[in-house]
Amino acid sequence: GLGGRLDATNVVVPLVSVVTNIGLEHTDLLGNTIERIAFEKAGIIKNNVPVVTGAKGNALQIIKKIAKERNAPLFAVERYADAKFDYLNGDFQQQNKDIVLTTINALKKFHPIKINQKQIKKGIKKTQWQGRLQFISKNVLVDCAHNPSGFEVLKKELKIIKNRRKINNFIFVVGIQKDKNIMEILNMIIPLISTIIFTKSKNENASAPQELLKIFNKINNEKPIETKIMDSPKKALSYARKIADKNDLIVVTGSIYLVEYVI
């Protein structure tokens, strides 16, 4: 969903509103600046309803302003350094954990909910997030990153994985939706790639692999990278497995619709 003012769920008056963080997403509908998107996301803030946010910088200032106008108590996300969270891959999950704990505290302050530390720990321990930095086998990682901010996180995590597991090469299986910033996304991952296989999901908004390859060739004029086009995610993954050595890592990414076909 879009999230924010234009999201269908915004008809509901919640116990607490949460704006996790702000990135350049759905720019055709929400605007092409962080400030404009922050304004749209802040559209979920209701009169007298507490709001939690992990936003920073200018985005946070806009959310603060709107929260004040609507008399909505604002909770900027606190860091809970003593609450370790290692049930999901990725350092960014620590921030997600902090958002959850801040939200629970906001709920407890304004509503008579009964929830104790033991229940919170149990809930966090059972958390699952399929398709986000998920290893579906020893050398196949799937990640549903589909915008520049998501790929920034993925890129950071892959560097950590490379050092920890002594990865030789990354083989990417990539499919991206037409409405995404394809050039920026591909440009971000070029330094990591040894081989890239372009494919597409069955979603009607999926970019043609040929178009992705065309854009890729336009921006990559320095690094020798093997490229391939396959007409389905499963065929692309099968080919990647065929060419991968034991110290290589296959990364399937670019679209939630793509990832669903391989997990």
PLM feature spans:
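Flexible active-site lid/hinge loop adjacent to a nucleotide/diphosphate
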Residues: G1-A55
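Short, active-site-adjacent cap segments at secondary-structure transitions
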Residues: R5-D7, A59-L60, L258-E260
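Nucleotide phosphate-binding/pyrophosphate-handling subdomain across enzymes
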Residues: R5-V18, I22-G23, R36, A83-T195
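Short, charged, surface-exposed secondary-structure boundary motifs
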Residues: H26-N32, K84-F85, N205-Q210
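Short, surface-exposed connector motifs at secondary-structure boundaries
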Residues: G43-V51, I161, R165-F170, L192-T195, ...
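C-terminal helical cap/extension that packs against the catalytic core
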Residues: V52, K56-F75, Q94, V140, ...
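Active-site-proximal loop/hinge segments that shape catalytic or ion-binding/gating pockets
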Residues: S255
